[in-house]
């Protein structure tokens, strides 16, 4: 944040340790990509930790001044508006099969089918040939890659341009993407750029909402959890568009998509123009507790003993990025991302009996998200990461018994297990980094993981193409192996965290 007021109130009377804990609670409930802005909300730099108690007394008066809200609106009206904003501008593409069904019915990429290869016996919203299925699902890879890669840009945009400009930029990308998507056809093949704009705009549009939690002193974690829940519920957008397009007589693909742009994103645009502030509402200040003061002193002593109190930015990044606490996190996150992004558009092949149920189950992923966040606060983040990965591991095992597709009952269990894992897909990275590292490099570390992970996840495209041509058994076994590798990485991370709770 660039405003003086916002900067002043962020210097809270809170130790680095307790500050990290508070952030882990808040971020535990966010199911989406992260950017550089994460280190800006209620977390100061590590070097500021010793001076926070002194700064708090100076800034207490500013913190007690209620933030100014446009038109004098009640903070609860703002909360409702922000929740609807999160729902309508959220990562709805993650419930990909609903969007894929609409694309199949519209005839997208049907021109890729070879002469005489079109299967006329399938339903209108099912793929007509393998080539069409591969091309449609390639769009999911493009959107998810763009979503993760541009997450860091969303954070930078928020930090340097402010909430309103960041929200308007994100919405401009979303409106452009969905408009191109609606107009795309065989004669105007704009599907790929549409997906790029869609993915790029999601976090840029969302991050400005974070300062809205500052309107509720003492309830910041709860409000962030509510935002995260509505972003998960945004999966209903794709399901609603699919339902209208398939079941309403006379509905066209272009009309349905542009209707969402006008009604859904149009509402979000009004919120961004008239409610989201130019400068972030300041974080609520709190008086330092005795334990917080002790934590500050202990942290300062530890830094002094290690001789790292005055590290340069480069030295600080080297310390964090090359630490044994961070290095295993990178392959872990990449492997999780690959398995999830392979499964999402392949559900029709892997769990055909639970295919439509999976579209609904995915919407309720906000429930385990909140529960896992609470567990992370009580037991630490690594045990929660183990729970998530074990859900993924069990799902891949079930998918292979007795073959693909597996037992019908198992397919519903797989859908639930995958939804649990997806609900905390990126939030576990937020929590792990904030719990173990000081805030000075949080945005860089999380942005790096999301961006590089998003690029590497492009490998899921050839994985799906191979599976469509040769069967899904081989790649399913590969995903099972990835989950087993992650169990080993998590065990190392658990032992390491017990030995080194905080990287100093």
UniProtKB/Swiss-Prot annotation:
Main localization category: membrane
Catalytic activity reported: L-tyrosine(in) = L-tyrosine(out)
Record keywords, A-Z: Amino-acid transport, Cell membrane, Glycoprotein, Membrane, Transmembrane, Transmembrane helix, Transport
GO cellular component, one term: plasma membrane
UniProt keyword Nucleus, yes or no: no
Transmembrane segments: 76-96, 138-158, 165-185, 206-226, 233-253, 256-276, 324-344, 356-376, 381-401, 406-426, 436-456, 475-495
Activity regulation (UniProt): L-tyrosine uptake is stimulated in trans by aromatic and large neutral amino acids, but not smaller or charged amino acids.
Entry-listed glycosylation sites: 310
Biological processes, Gene Ontology terms: intracellular amino acid homeostasis; L-tyrosine import across plasma membrane
Bilayer topology annotation: Multi-pass membrane protein
One matching Pfam family: MFS_1
UniProt-annotated location(s): Cell membrane
Tree of life domain: Eukaryota
Biased composition (Basic and acidic residues): 8-24
Gene Ontology terms, MF aspect: L-tyrosine transmembrane transporter activity
Sequence segments annotated as region (Disordered): 1-24
PANTHER family: PROTEIN FMP42
Protein family (similarity comment): Belongs to the SLC43A transporter (TC 2.A.1.44) family.
Function as written in the Swiss-Prot or TrEMBL entry: L-tyrosine transporter that is essential for parasite survival and virulence. May also act as an aromatic and large neutral amino acid transporter. Does not cotransport other charged ions. Involved in amino acid homeostasis by facilitating the net uptake of L-tyrosine and maintaining intracellular pools of aromatic and large neutral amino acids through exchange.
Protein name: Aromatic and large neutral amino acid transporter 5-3
